[in-house]
Amino acid sequence: MKNRLPAALMTIVGMAFSASVAADVTPMTLRDGRIGYVMTNLFWSVYQTPDAKEECPKGFNDGPREQFEILFPDVENRTVVDTQLAQEIETWHPTTEPDPLPFYDIEGPYSYGLNLDGEVGQNDFTHPDGTQGIDNEVYRAVGCIIGFRGPDGVEVIFQDKAIADRAYNRTMIELSGVDNLENDDSVTVTVYRGMDRLLTDATGMKVMSGGSQRVDLRWGAKLIRQTEGKIVDSVLTTEPIADVVIPWMNLGVPTFQLIRDMRFQLDLSPTNANGLIAGYADVDTYYKQLIRNDSTHHLSNGQISGISLYKALSRLADAYPDPETGRNTAISTALDVKMAQVFIVHPDGEASMPQHTTD
């Protein structure tokens, strides 16, 4: 009997302590008007229905193995140079010549992404929430390739997993000048490269908020970018950044993506920032990142023909025309991104000023 009262008091004290901790979450993570987030997941936004009939009525695209059988039905009578090597050479040195084989673009009306050019064009997508004028031509190119479709597409698995696994891929953002995370009409957003492993739970599989990341000013100084944004109903929207390099190693090969006019649209909380990165991906950089990481062998597992995909990306490119040829060199895109709150550690005495800012 005599032990029940202390036990009850301990329960009440514990509940009060838990409530006070919960109430202090925001002050703990928002320090001097600053809060940082580190990227944990990243992949190209792909709108998909369960049976794919809406967006891919003609079916999925063939990969290297399937195309090889079509192109060389008489392979026994031909040389390796004329068949395997010829295809491999074109994979690594693709052209914009018309594709001799069928390639199926997305035909459905819907896509995730943002309106990048401020216009509603005839070929633009509509967001599932009804927003018109969505620009996402990368989705039009990759949406009917099984390797880019979740949850078990080979690119979905390996490209996304590499973001958390590899310190090389450590991209983070720091918001400064923040009054609160619900509504703020003016905040500064700085993109940094981090240096450290992510904080995870005991399984090592789940990334936790509350870790720390040192700013990489040796190899990452030239990757620092800065822009302005605003927070409305806990959604951060930024102004475009002229160009952003995203380190994206996959399967051990150091590579990156170059996104022009890149902007963030993120749902913010004291522990996470999830949403979209959108802009125009440089076509050649996009392709090099894919083929250098995966090669024909791995791409075949997702029925991804590098030859056909490069032709599609070049054909659908919708921005940054080459001044000499007039050919567009960048293609509109959106990426699903998840970030965990992190405490960003700046080097003592080092001025972490951005190298490039908003246009």
Where are the predicted features?
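Residue-level detector of intrinsically disordered terminal segments
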Residues: 9, 14, 204-207
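Extracytosolic secretory-pathway proteins
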Residues: 23-359
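N-terminal signal peptide c-region/cleavage motif recognized by signal peptidases
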Residues: 17-18
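Bacterial N-terminal signal peptides that target proteins for export
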Residues: 1-8
